[in-house]
């Protein structure tokens, strides 16, 4: 425990802003960047949820590992598994056999990544709303 729930909203706000960035990147045809930023959206949103629940900010960048630590549903866990694939490969040429990542990522991959990131954001925002209801009901 010992997290800082007051900062949870900051993490969630940044995740939301990053989602806007990912959407803009998609519209501009930057598909590798869209995929990477979507991984960041999910990571930051889940870190927000961890803080909200009173946990220390999760260290590391694996959406899958953060989701496991939060004992979150399979839908989010599966989204994390897919998004984690983009953390390195969407940015570094030495993470792919040949070519630059921006040349290799497709609109379909980026669209899928946006869907996964949106799913995580929706679930985390719902978690925040549920927490507010609990707090107002216990007063």
Report the location of each language-model feature:
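Terminal alpha-helical segments
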Residues: 1-139
